[in-house]
Amino acid sequence: MFFYSPNVAPQPSSTSHRRPTLTHQHHLHVGHLDTRLSVQIPEILSRSLVHDPERTRLVPEQLRFIIDENQELWTGSQPPTGFLELCASPVSSVFSNADARRMSQRKLVLRRPTISIQEDGKIIIDHVTARWEGANINSQSALLDADDGATVITDTIKDDQDDKEPKSCPQQTVKYIKILTPHVILVSVLIGYLCLGAWILMLLETRTELLARSKKLVRLTNLMSNFTAESWKMLNNAQHGVSNMDEGEWAATFREWMVRVSETVDDRRPIRRELNRPDDLSNMHNKWTFPTAILYVLTVLTTCGYGEVSVDTDVGKVFSVAFALVGIPLMFITAADIGKFLSETLLQFVSFWNRSVRKVKQWMSRIRHGRRKSLQSTGGPNDTLDILGVDGTEEKLWFPIGAYVSCICIYCSIGSAMFITWERTWSFIHAFHFGFNLIVTVGLGDIVVTDYIFLSLIVAFVIVGLSVVTMCVDLASTHLKAYFTRIHYFGRAKRFLGMSEELKEIVALLGAMRRKKGGKVTWNDVRDFLDNELRDRPFEPHELLMKLRFIDETSSGMSTIRHNSFQSDFFRESEYIRRVAALRPEQPAYL
């Protein structure tokens, strides 16, 4: 333990550091950890007092009581009354909760973060500086830096507190609104982006499309006139004096047949009305309507094709490329976000179903055997064990690959039932094929949509369908990765598969040594590391935290710092580096 007495003259530079303490809450049962300190003991490593009064406060009465019980550690009969404790966050962080659950369902290990305050007011928080008995740090948390650890632990604390504190209906409503707001904004931005792109393409492509169609109709009219005149001449020469057919009558009959042929070739256009005024653009049928433009930009973002319309102008082509560069990531981010919600909902439903089935089986077993068995309560201190199995281990939900295929097929079937209500001429198979092509980004074909409700349904079907596909891929990724690994390593040795935590730590250690050296790590480097870190490591008694001792700031005092703790900015000061270099001249950079 390191304490600072205000009677010592302050030095020009000042930095305070606090190591973790174990908190014994009165409402928690910590088992064999009862013998540890039952109060929060501050440890301050400092060469001088922090001058800012806002950063310090008096040591609590509990600490004074503990000090009274350890009067033999003091030179006088009474402990000094001017001790100061570094102000830290009053919130204790849950550390390695999963490990504590495996030991006992009623054990919970709490620890406080390490907090360092610099002269400029910067606060450095380190959550991974100590290993407590029964709650070891895993390899992933050990590789986190201080900022990442602080973020993870802080989020966990906030979630736990939110779950425990009862909230009123307005508070719950505000909470859900805050959760839904960014996702609603994301979907709204995507829909607005689609509408903006459709409107811009309509402005760019409408006149070009109408002019091209007008020229086509003028050519068709001239062709029909020339063919009529030439045919009449041929017919008149062939039947000179034999037939009494009038020219106008013959032209009208022949023109009608040609119009019918044109309507057969282009059955989606009102060609009979357009032929009456081929030079009038307002009389032309425009295929760049808002529904077709929406479908086109939708196919651009979903990387599928649409055969009804295409971009012809150079400006429109450039705009389509720029629109796709921004819109494609936006589309897939939105689909991934919705898919994540769907996957979490599905996992929660399956987890709830499994718990319900397990409880029903336990209840039936009690009735069958005629004896009462205590079941896990749904309230109280075991709320955190809802997602755990009977043995206290976390359940791993598994779905066969066929379940994901069935999910996509069911969604396409629902869409086909919706499509055939709007397109009466479609069969179920045709509608199913159309919906499947939409969500797997094959293409829209050459469908022409005139109803805005049907258009909205298609857009919603595509966005939600991509989310469903993303959800299925997200849930099946673990199994697909396992199958791919088996295929990839078929007939070969599987390297680094099923690696234990110890091996992973060794690999991480070698990586840190390689980054420090800047080249290949040799056996001599590993041997030097083992000699410096294992042979020269000072001994730390197991009951170190159970005793209160004064240790002045000498090299031996600094050696009690745990060798595996991350260095905060306090440890990077020149004075400390000099002192540590004297103890461990070849200390690795990652320590």
Curated annotation (Swiss-Prot):
Keywords: Glycoprotein, Ion channel, Ion transport, Membrane, Transmembrane, Transmembrane helix, Transport
Predominant location category: membrane
Biological process according to GO: locomotion; muscle contraction; parturition; potassium ion transmembrane transport; regulation of muscle contraction
Record-linked InterPro entries: 2pore_dom_K_chnl (IPR003280), K_chnl_dom (IPR013099)
GO cellular component, one term: plasma membrane
Residue spans crossing the bilayer: 184-204, 289-309, 318-338, 400-420, 428-448, 453-473
Record membrane topology: Multi-pass membrane protein
Knockout or disruption consequences: Worms exhibit defects in mobility. Mutation causes a dumpy (dpy) phenotype thought to be due to hyper-activation of body-wall muscle. Severe mutations cause paralysis thought to be a result of fully contracted muscles.
Region (Disordered) location: 1-24
GO molecular function annotations of the record: outward rectifier potassium channel activity; potassium ion leak channel activity
Subcellular location as annotated: Membrane
Glycosylation: residue positions: N226
Function: Has a role in mobility, possibly in the transport of potassium in muscles.
Protein family: Belongs to the two pore domain potassium channel (TC 1.A.1.8) family.
Designated name of the protein: Uncoordinated protein 58
Organism: Caenorhabditis elegans
